[in-house]
């Protein structure tokens, strides 16, 4: 078999090899993004399975909750661990919620995680930001606990007729 190359085919071969070399970094970046997406999806699925296991156990399995709370605790300590002074709710609570939103989107889960994190961070003098983080979590729990109770009450008691009216 004989292959003949002319000037036009050589130019097109060169341009296609240049295109391949140009597309290689883009392809590797897309591959990395896809791998990260798959890892995050598998992490989300793992968290969901752990939450199902936690809710299915009677009494609730605190070891599972500790596994669920560990990455949240690390993220909160990384974000708020060095803060000092008093909590500014208008600024700090939305930041706390954005950190929590990265892990779960349900208020009832936030409540369980925050209570576990609060139990795990006993304020002491060796770490500077722990009293700040404890105060911040307490302020968020003062909002979460009543609102979760209201939602829970509406979900469980909405079928009952109110006889007082």
Curated annotation (Swiss-Prot):
Keywords associated with the record: Plasmid, Secreted, Virulence
Extent of the signal sequence: none
One Gene Ontology cellular component annotation held by this UniProt entry: type III protein secretion system complex
Pfam families (UniProt xref): T3SS_needle_reg
Keyword Secreted part of the UniProt annotation: yes
Gene3D superfamilies assigned: Type III secretion system virulence factor YopR, core domain (1.10.10.1000)
Biological processes annotated in GO: protein secretion by the type III secretion system
Induction comment from the UniProt entry of this chain: At 37 degrees Celsius in the absence of calcium. Belongs to an operon involved in the translocation of Yop proteins across the bacterial membranes or in the specific control of this function.
InterPro entries: T3SS_YopR, YopR_core
Localization in the cell: Secreted
Cysteines paired by S-S bonds: none
Task of the protein: May be involved in the regulation of the assembly of the type III secretion system (T3SS), also called injectisome, which is used to inject bacterial effector proteins into eukaryotic host cells. May control the secretion and/or polymerization of YscF/SctF, the principal component of the needle filament, thereby impacting the assembly of the T3SS. Involved in pathogenesis.
The family this protein is said to belong to: Belongs to the YopR family.
Protein known as: Type 3 secretion system regulator YopR
């Amino acid at each position: 078999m004989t292959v003949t190359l002319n000037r036009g085919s050589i130019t097109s071969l060169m341009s296609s090899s240049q295109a391949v070399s140009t597309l290689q970094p883009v392809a590797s970046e897309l591959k990395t993004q896809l791998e990260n997406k798959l890892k995050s999806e598998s992490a989300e699925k793992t968290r969901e399975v752990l939450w199902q296991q936690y809710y299915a156990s009677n009494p609730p399995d605190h070891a599972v909750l500790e596994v669920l709370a560990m990455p949240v605790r690390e993220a909160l300590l990384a974000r708020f661990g060095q803060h000092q002074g008093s909590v500014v709710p208008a600024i700090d609570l939305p930041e706390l919620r954005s950190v929590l939103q990265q892990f779960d989107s349900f208020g009832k889960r936030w409540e369980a995680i925050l209570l576990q994190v609060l139990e795990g961070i006993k304020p002491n003098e060796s770490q500077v930001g722990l009293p700040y983080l404890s105060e911040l979590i307490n302020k968020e729990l003062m909002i979460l606990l009543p609102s979760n109770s209201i939602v829970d009450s509406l979900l469980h008691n909405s079928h009952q007729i109110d006889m007082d009216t």
